[in-house]
Structures are given as structure tokens and as C-alpha cells.
A protein has these predicted regions:
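Boundary/entry segment of secreted carbohydrate-active catalytic domains
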Residues: 121-156, 171-179
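Aromatic- and acid-rich polysaccharide-binding/catalytic face
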Residues: 203, 250-292, 296-314, 349
């Protein structure tokens, strides 16, 4: 009996020891899963403001016995992935300026489900361009709620150990810029090693003072970029004006590319300054040209340099009218850019606010980084709802409709002349770029009433490549006074859009 008691005691001790081991192991596993849940997602960082486009969700693959991961964005399943490597990555695309949530759900082989903590992040299109000479010396990009930047170089300010450290945590986009002592292949290799997603290419190759390349030479350079790009997404060469208006440089460059070369152009980088400003329609016309670029090339657009400035027109920062013009332009254009899903990113060019000719387009002072009123407007626009943005007490909204139709309707049509003839009149119209045709409307009523007695009629005429469109309207009533107006129309994505009516011309028909 005594022997039996000893045996039972030993069995009980072993059982207790074993159960303790199981309990300890269970606690360890629970600790591991809790730790993983809190530390799973590596990027984006919590509450981070990041640039629109392709976004990486990265997480640690440190849980044991994972069967598969599920990636959720805003609560919607986007991808199911098998575990592989130390760090997992899922890439998704968005140009919506808003806040997002990301969560990773791990399904283990024993059917246990482990969820990561929810990660909040915010997306903006807004960026900034700075150089190491003076533009980047003092400014804090966070003061304008910026999501990305570039510096006309393939190395970031951080890589250059630049004195202003406030750019260190901001997404950097490298640029080839032009021919350099460092080969294209080495610049692309460097960018890939750094983990950058994009590469801007040649800067204003159509200008002698910039990268200065002929279209045929640029095609060779473009091939070099394609051969060296690795995982980089390439932006187009940025001509000094809208590509769609660059007949002497961009058109021959583009037409000389084969389909593979075109396919490797992930986005079009636009440099386009507004050289004059009449009224709000000027800003809408600017947006219309952006629309036309996308309609023609079907590629996402980055506006990497823009402002209101011109060597011939002055925009003085001490002139209230000039300041108001630039501010109105910014409000309208930024509203339109943020609304357009095909616009991925934009960055305003900061002219020195102390320059008497271009300073009205300055958004911050080079020496102090202090924002101008225009800079405060820039800071207030394009911020996702819910983001803890820096806000400024300046008006930054506009009631202007910036839809495609409204932008086309801002494009003017000009009638050079209307001349009376025998039972007829002739007209001369200034050609509108990329017009599909024109409408000539004439009536005995200056308001163009459709009542029968006013004989209001509209004639459609086709567009030509000529700079002036001439024609004649016949079979009119002699000695009667007719009112005449003209408007162009465009066809974009198969739909007809009408431009603005011309001024009304009055003509009295001859006998």
C-alpha cells in the first residue's frame, strides 16, 4: 500500500509539472500573439501623412505556423497572401485624399485567427520641391501638411546630410534631372537600394538652360532608364510647358517611342506656369489643359512645378491685386487637382517672396521658412478629413465649379470679324486649340430667343488645322440686323463639350 501511495504521488507530481508546462507554453503563445498584434504593421506609420499613388503596407512575418495573411483596407479584404520572408508587403493604389485604415489578419494552421492592431494613415497629393542652395534651408514641410518632396537630385536631403533635418521623415522622390558624371544606371541602382518607388526623369530637356536634350537623344536616354529602372516607376521628361502644347519637342519625342517604351512611362510629369491671369476662367483653362493631357495619353499626372509667373508679366508680392490673382488661381486649381482621380501628385514652386517680379507666388521665405498668406492657403488645402493638420486663419475655399465641363466652358472663342454682304455675312474665327468644330449662331434677337419670328439658327462647322476659320452664312433677309456669336466645341473621351461663346457681333445685311 505504501508503495502504491508513492507511485500515485509521483504520477500526480508529473501531471502537475506537465500541466504547468502546458500553461506556461499557452501563456507564452498568448504573449507572442499579443506582441505581434501590436507590432505587426511596420508601415505606414500610425497617423502618417503620405503621398498618393502606390502605397506599401508592410508587416512582420514573425508569427509561427501562419497558414495565410489577409490584408484589409478600410475594413475591406484586399488580398490573401501566403507567408514568405521576414517582412510581408502588399501594395495598393489610391488618389483619394482621405484617411485610411489597414489591418492584417493572420490565420494559423490550427485555424486560430490573430488580428493586428488597426493602423490609421492619411493620403494627400500635396508635395513640395526644394533645392539645397536656399529653398530648403529653413522651411518645415510639416507646416504645410506636405506628404512628399523632391530636390532635383537622385539623393535626398538626408542622404546629403543637409543642415535642415525636417525633411528626414518625409517621402523623397529622386530625379535623374539630366546627363551627369553619375551614370543613369548607377542613379537607378541607388534609388532601388534606398527602396524608393518612383523616379522623375529629365528636367525641361527642351530648354538650353536646363537638361537640354533633343527629342531623339532623349529617346536613347529613356531606353537607358528603362533598362536600369529595376522596380522604379518612371515619370516622363518634364517639358517647360504642357506636353500637349509642346509640338516641337514632346510630340516628336512621344511619336518616336515604341509601345513598350510608352508603357514604361508610369506617369506624366507636368511643368507648367501660368504666365498671365485675367480672372477665374484663367484657372479653369489651366485645369482644362491638364484634362486634355490625360485624355490624350491616358496616364496619371504629376504636376511637379507650377505657379503664376512669367518673365514678361509682373506678380509683385507688394501689389494687392497680384496677390489676390495668385491666391484665386491656387484655390481653384488645387480644388480641381484634388478632385481629379487621374492626378496623383502636385508640388507648387516657391518663388522667393522677396522677388518683386515673381514673389506673389511665394509660399514661404527662404531664410526663415515662415509661410506667406499664399503658403497658408497651400497648407489649408488638400488635407484628408481627420488628419491633425496645421491650420491657418485664412480663406482657402472657392465656390467655382471645377468639373471638366466647366473648365471647357471657360475656354474663349474669338471672332475676328463679321462682315455684311448681299443677303449674307462672312465671318472669321480664331482657331481654338484641339477644337473638334464650331457653332455659328445668328438671330434677329440679341438674346438669341428661339421664337420663330427671330429666325435664330445655329450652323455647325468642322475644325481645320488653319489658325483662322473663315466662312459665309447665306440666304438672310436683306436690310435686317443680325446678332452673331460663335463657340468652339471639343470631344473628350467621346463626349462633346462646349467652349465659351464669343462676344456678340452685330451686322446689318446688305440689299
Amino acid at each position: 500500500m505504501e508503495k502504491m501511495k508513492k507511485i500515485l504521488a509521483m504520477v500526480l507530481s508529473v501531471a502537475l509539472l506537465f500541466s504547468g508546462m502546458i500553461f506556461d507554453n499557452t501563456v507564452t503563445k498568448a504573449d507572442e500573439t499579443n506582441t505581434w498584434s501590436g507590432e505587426a504593421i511596420i508601415s505606414p506609420e500610425q497617423n502618417k501623412l503620405i503621398g498618393a499613388g502606390y502605397i506599401d503596407i508592410k508587416w512582420n512575418n514573425t508569427l509561427e505556423n501562419v497558414k495565410q495573411y489577409k490584408v484589409y483596407i478600410d475594413g475591406t479584404l484586399k488580398k490573401t497572401m501566403s507567408p514568405s520572408g521576414d517582412i510581408m508587403k502588399f501594395e495598393f493604389y489610391t488618389t483619394n485624399v482621405k484617411g485610411y485604415t489597414a489591418q492584417i489578419v493572420a490565420e494559423l494552421k490550427d485555424n486560430t485567427v490573430v488580428k493586428s492592431d488597426v493602423r490609421n494613415f492619411y493620403v494627400t497629393k500635396k508635395g513640395i520641391c526644394v533645392n539645397r542652395k536656399d529653398m530648403g534651408a529653413a522651411v518645415d514641410p510639416a507646416s504645410m501638411n506636405i506628404g512628399w518632396y523632391y530636390d532635383w537630385d537622385y539623393k535626398s536631403l538626408k542622404d546629403w546630410n543637409y543642415k535642415n533635418k525636417k525633411f528626414c521623415d518625409l517621402e523623397f522622390v529622386p530625379m535623374i534631372w539630366g546627363d551627369d558624371l553619375v551614370d543613369i544606371s548607377k542613379r537607378c541602382e541607388y534609388a532601388n537600394r534606398k527602396g524608393y518607388k518612383y523616379m522623375l526623369s529629365y528636367n525641361e530637356p527642351d530648354l538650353k538652360g536646363e537638361s537640354n536634350k533633343q527629342p531623339d537623344t532623349m529617346r536613347y536616354r529613356w531606353n537607358e532608364m528603362i533598362d536600369s529602372k529595376g522596380s522604379l516607376r518612371l515619370g516622363s521628361p518634364a517639358t517647360e510647358t504642357f506636353q500637349i502644347n509642346s509640338d516641337k519637342w514632346w510630340t516628336p519625342f512621344w511619336n518616336g517611342l515604341n509601345q513598350t517604351q510608352k508603357n514604361n512611362m508610369t506617369f506624366i510629369a507636368v511643368h507648367a506656369y501660368q504666365h498671365y491671369y485675367d480672372n477665374a476662367d484663367t484657372a479653369l483653362e489651366y485645369l482644362h489643359t491638364i484634362d486634355e493631357i490625360y485624355a490624350k495619353y491616358k496616364k496619371p499626372i504629376w504636376i511637379t512645378e507650377f505657379a503664376v509667373a512669367d518673365s514678361g508679366n509682373v506678380f509683385n508680392p507688394k501689389n494687392a491685386k497680384h496677390n489676390a490673382q495668385v491666391q484665386e488661381f491656387m484655390k481653384i486649381v488645387l480644388k480641381g487637382l484634388n478632385e481629379r482621380s487621374y492626378v496623383e501628385r502636385y508640388s507648387w514652386f516657391d518663388f522667393n517672396p522677396e522677388d518683386s517680379k515673381t514673389g506673389a507666388s511665394g509660399i514661404y521665405y527662404y531664410d526663415t521658412g515662415k509661410l506667406t498668406t499664399l503658403g497658408q492657403i497651400y497648407a489649408n488645402i488638400g488635407n484628408p478629413a481627420g488628419y491633425n493638420a496645421k491650420k491657418y486663419n485664412v480663406s482657402y475655399t472657392t465656390s467655382k465649379n471645377t468639373s471638366m465641363a466647366s473648365c471647357v466652358a471657360a475656354v474663349p472663342t474669338t471672332v475676328y470679324s463679321v462682315t455684311a454682304k448681299k443677303k449674307a455675312f462672312s465671318y472669321s474665327i480664331k482657331s481654338v486649340k484641339r477644337a473638334a468644330g464650331y457653332q455659328v449662331q445668328y438671330s434677329l434677337n440679341k438674346k438669341f430667343s428661339t421664337k420663330k419670328k427671330y429666325k435664330t439658327k445655329t450652323k455647325n462647322i468642322s475644325a481645320t488645322s488653319a489658325t483662322v476659320k473663315n466662312g459665309t452664312i447665306k440666304k438672310l433677309t436683306k436690310k435686317k440686323t443680325y446678332y452673331v456669336r460663335v463657340r468652339a466645341y471639343k470631344v473628350i473621351n467621346g463626349k462633346k463639350y462646349y467652349c465659351k461663346w464669343s462676344k456678340i457681333n452685330k451686322v446689318k445685311i446688305k440689299k
